[in-house]
């Protein structure tokens, strides 16, 4: 089921966890250890790359739970993993691990819950985000769409009331996957600045630590609405922040790919050169400014890879041009859709790029996306992937 191959220099024999052996598998010497967390419809799978070889733990964590959100928090002396699981019997919860996913803890009281006066109940956790400028702060995005803040590294969370009580909330509507707050971006320069995205309400920003919020969607189209350019109501699928310029953001919309150069106040369409502008995922290169990745999907009514080819597209110049990245990826009759949190980068140099799809396949690149290897197949639907250097 799970492969452990990686392209590079030289040849080696690799024994898979299932017992089979591949001859003449390319070997690469990698000094850093990378942890990969793959959240699926039926559990969390964890892989590690050591010395150029990937190995995956036997079986999933949180068996039969949908894991929509994962975070790898490397800010402290010991990395902490956070996972948002959703049990059909016990309901949703947030778990944490301080030993790279070997063992997990769940708080005695629910980490994320809606206060009684809201009249709401937690459906799932869509996002877990360690804050860029506050070492112990973690944000959670949920369904129904709400933002929560933790000051103890994700063990307990408090509802950010001003966003929950925003005057536009009564006009927010669920997207196809539900009404979820799926993106949280913090600013290393200013802990008071937070950007979130909601499907279907659009982008909202605060510059005063969450006391007030404003829609931030100027230039982003909502072609499905009577007014195609509303203040809010856009079906934003994902937003990522540039590595060099914190005010530069990349946005994958229901239709359209956009860039902002002023922290989201205004957006410019950068979709020219892509085979399709529909898609779910966008990720930024961890070190190289102006570089971002998307995975184009044919259309909202035809949710398969553009031209039925498995290709990540990369821009090296903030959206002025796009290049397809397909070396090592299947190119014939491919139907694996990549969801909004199933594309990510690590913080290695060169950068690792990763994605998983609804076919249960996981692919990785160790060279900024130039070449790819398949790490896993036959998993449940991949909902999210996260990777980080941990050693």
What annotation goes with each model-predicted range?
Residues 4-7, 12, 16-391:
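Extracellular glycan-interacting surfaces
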